[in-house]
């Protein structure tokens, strides 16, 4: 089940509300990534404390480890990971296609060697839907081929991107058919592909909308933009985003997959995106790269050795309320696990507060003012 209410707009920016089987999600929203069933360095209680409404799990990795039988014993992924709010799972396609020489793509699906033990495995639209049904995620992603930006060290040609996109469209239909056959009570999202080529993006979206229409408008609960932030220049990412996002069906949520920086999130919301996910805030946190209202901080740098200030005096997260830059610098230098935890709490809090601020700005029809202030604050740099 997915009900989406578009509450108000400000330009192309949208303020919405998704009602899913495990709860309500206020949009626009950022989804922390829990690849193996855990958001790195964070407990479910901590995620709720910083305002996480929905988290993402990885179908491919959870299928391989711990295996579906283990998750079945917990009545699905929510019970296994101890999270009672909504969850989204990807289809596993991106991870399979990232295996390079270890995989072979056919019309039926993808044959590949397990990165864990080398076993020969096969993943198809049907199998992906069956796995995600057993995981019981609130939002299920269609099985697709993520068109790479580069093939053999050069940008993908339009013909290569077209072949990949059309394969994804055929797989979208098969995903939809299997989702229906499984009687999955959750929501299926289609994924717009087409590389850096606007006409191919248009063709992909039209094909997904045809599948949706054939199911009486119930074919897809939402629409995602895939194949961005895969190595392309930033200007190409923004160009494709600004072309596709306004064309997505207005009555369904819009999801920009795998993106990105704080600036990317603001640009995405300005273009009409409702949902984001990215490993950046958690990965950067573990590496000591911290996001603040006034720019980024590399906490390992010597300049922070004796600094008694919090990371961001305007931030209300647990880390900023209780610890100094000097202490976080020390933890990073000596490799203490607590450092990774405190950094992650801060970065995810920053991302989620950024989304909350954008929701408020859209509600008050002051998003343009917010966006200008955001850019000026970030450009100032952390002092």
From Swiss-Prot:
Binding site for Zn(2+): 315, 317, 320, 346
Record's GO cellular component terms: cytosol
Active site: 90 (proton acceptor), 277 (nucleophile)
Keywords annotated in UniProt: Glycosyltransferase, Metal-binding, Queuosine biosynthesis, Transferase, tRNA processing, Zinc
Cofactor(s) needed by this chain: Zn(2+)
Record field: catalytic activity: 7-aminomethyl-7-carbaguanine + guanosine(34) in tRNA = 7-aminomethyl-7-carbaguanosine(34) in tRNA + guanine
Function: Catalyzes the base-exchange of a guanine (G) residue with the queuine precursor 7-aminomethyl-7-deazaguanine (PreQ1) at position 34 (anticodon wobble position) in tRNAs with GU(N) anticodons (tRNA-Asp, -Asn, -His and -Tyr). Catalysis occurs through a double-displacement mechanism. The nucleophile active site attacks the C1' of nucleotide 34 to detach the guanine base from the RNA, forming a covalent enzyme-RNA intermediate. The proton acceptor active site deprotonates the incoming PreQ1, allowing a nucleophilic attack on the C1' of the ribose to form the product.
The protein's assembly and partners: Homodimer. Within each dimer, one monomer is responsible for RNA recognition and catalysis, while the other monomer binds to the replacement base PreQ1.
Name used for this protein in its record: Queuine tRNA-ribosyltransferase
């Amino acid at each position: 089940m997915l009900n989406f209410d578009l509450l108000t707009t400000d330009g192309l920016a949208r303020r919405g509300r998704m009602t899913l089987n495990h709860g309500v999600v206020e949009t626009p929203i950022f989804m922390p990534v829990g690849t193996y069933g855990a958001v790195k360095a964070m407990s479910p209680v901590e995620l709720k404390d910083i305002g996480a409404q929905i988290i993402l799990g990885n179908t491919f990795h959870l299928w391989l480890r711990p295996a579906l039988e283990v998750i079945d014993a917990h009545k699905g992924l929510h019970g296994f990971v101890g999270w009672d709010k909504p969850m989204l799972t990807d289809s596993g396609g991106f991870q399979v296609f990232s295996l390079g020489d270890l995989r072979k793509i056919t019309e039926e699906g993808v044959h590949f060697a397990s990165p864990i033990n080398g076993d020969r495995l096969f993943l198809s639209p049907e199998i992906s839907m069956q796995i995600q049904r057993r995981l019981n995620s609130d939002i299920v992603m269609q099985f697709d081929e993520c068109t790479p930006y580069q093939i053999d060290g050069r940008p993908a040609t339009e013909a290569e991107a077209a072949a990949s996109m059309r394969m994804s469209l055929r797989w979208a239909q098969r995903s939809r058919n299997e989702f229906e056959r499984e009687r999955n009570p959750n929501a299926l999202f289609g994924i717009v592909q087409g590389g850096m080529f606007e006409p191919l993006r248009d063709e992909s979206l039209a094909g997904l909308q045809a599948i949706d229409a054939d199911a009486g408008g119930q074919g897809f609960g939402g629409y995602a933009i895939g194949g961005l932030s895969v190595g392309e220049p930033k200007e190409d990412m923004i160009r494709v985003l600004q072309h596709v996002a306004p064309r997505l069906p207005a009555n369904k949520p819009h999801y920009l997959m795998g993106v990105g920086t704080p600036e990317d999130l603001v640009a995405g919301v300005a273009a009409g995106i409702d949902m984001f996910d990215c490993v950046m805030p958690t990965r950067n946190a573990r590496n000591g790269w911290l996001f603040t209202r006034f720019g980024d901080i590399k906490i390992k740098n010597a300049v922070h050795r004796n600094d008694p200030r919090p990371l961001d005096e305007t931030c209300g997260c647990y880390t900023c309320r209780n610890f100094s830059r000097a202490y976080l610098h020390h933890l990073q230098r000596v490799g203490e696990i607590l450092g990774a935890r405190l950094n992650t709490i801060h970065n995810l809090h920053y991302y989620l507060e950024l989304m909350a601020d954008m929701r408020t700005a859209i509600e008050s029809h002051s998003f343009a003012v917010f966006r200008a202030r955001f850019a000026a604050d970030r450009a100032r740099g952390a002092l």
